């Protein structure tokens, strides 16, 4: 596997949630740096018994939803 893609959403409290689009990996972090560390750790844990299947790269895709008032 060459790359895993995580969709990142920001919670109302400011923290972040990361969900992998192709594997059953979900994690969270209070800050962006903590999230990055937790994603790496979650991926290592998910593939601990299959080191040859570990991805070469991890892509974090931040999704932000914003509603703008029209009046």
Name every feature range the model reports, one short phrase each.
Residues 14-50:
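Amphipathic, hydrophobic secondary-structure cores in small proteins
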Residues 9-13:
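Short beta-strand micro-motifs enriched in acidic
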Residues 1-5, 37-71:
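Short, charged, surface-exposed hinge/linker loops at domain edges
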Residues 5-7, 17:
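Short, surface-exposed charged micro-motifs
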